[in-house]
């Protein structure tokens, strides 16, 4: 099994939800994900029930980018190692898309601009049904450190209204409380 390309991204959390307001803001978190593009299936099962990685390959092709030399779609497989809990609001789908796009770029020596990466991630997330809005602000936050305020109605290349490098990680702490724990505590009272 050969690693054709490798990409990384990180999780994020919403500060302002785009679906209700048309403006979204998300902040990067120190939760990493690494995606590898492989020529054979990974030894570890990749859980992609929503098929966002398949949709992402289609977005890559629609954008006019090549597949790795000598490989067809059916020859490509993924390996994912993630510290981002799924379905907890920590932007695991957006981070997976960004890391996978970076792996494709690494495998093909094609390096789309950041706004092109966000556009392909948004297209894949909507096509796979994991997002109604494309999670544009989430993809930006998974792509770069800090936080961004994004106008999701604007063209992606022009949609970042404000951004900031973020807080010094030494100055703040994010606590992740599993949903099951909060349900248990609610029933005890």
Predicted features by range, described:
Residues 1-88:
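ATP-binding N-lobe of GHMP and related small-molecule kinases
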Residues 2-9, 170-178:
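Short amphipathic
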Residues 4, 15, 156-162:
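Local beta-strand/beta-hairpin segments that build beta-sheet-rich folds
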Residues 73-158:
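Gly/Ser-rich oxyanion-binding loop with an adjacent helix/lid
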Residues 7-8, 17-18, 26-29, 131-134, ...:
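Solvent-exposed alpha-helices and their adjacent loops that cap or buttress functional pockets
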Residues 39, 143, 152, 171-180:
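Short, structured patches in soluble enzyme cores that scaffold and shape functional sites
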Residues 182-189:
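Conserved small/polar residues in nucleotide/adenosyl-binding loops
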């Amino acid at each position: 099994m050969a690693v054709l390309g490798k990409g990384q991204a990180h999780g994020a959390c919403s500060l302002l939800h785009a679906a209700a307001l048309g403006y979204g803001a998300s902040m990067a978190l120190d939760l990493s994900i690494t995606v590898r593009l492989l020529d054979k299936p990974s030894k570890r099962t990749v859980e992609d029930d929503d098929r966002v990685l398949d949709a992402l390959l289609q977005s890559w092709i629609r954008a006019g980018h090549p597949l790795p030399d000598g490989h067809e779609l059916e020859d490509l497989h993924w390996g994912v190692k993630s510290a981002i809990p799924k379905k907890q609001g920590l932007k695991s789908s957006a981070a997976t898309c960004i890391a996978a796009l970076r792996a494709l770029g690494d495998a093909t020596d094609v390096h789309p601009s950041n706004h092109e990466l966000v556009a392909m991630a948004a297209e894949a997330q909507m096509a796979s049904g994991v997002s109604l809005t494309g999670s544009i602000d989430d993809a930006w936050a998974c792509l770069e450190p800090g936080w961004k305020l994004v106008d999701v109605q604007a063209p992606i290349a022009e949609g970042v209204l404000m951004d900031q490098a973020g807080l010094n990680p030494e100055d703040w702490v994010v606590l992740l409380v599993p949903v099951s724990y909060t349900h248990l505590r609610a029933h005890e009272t």
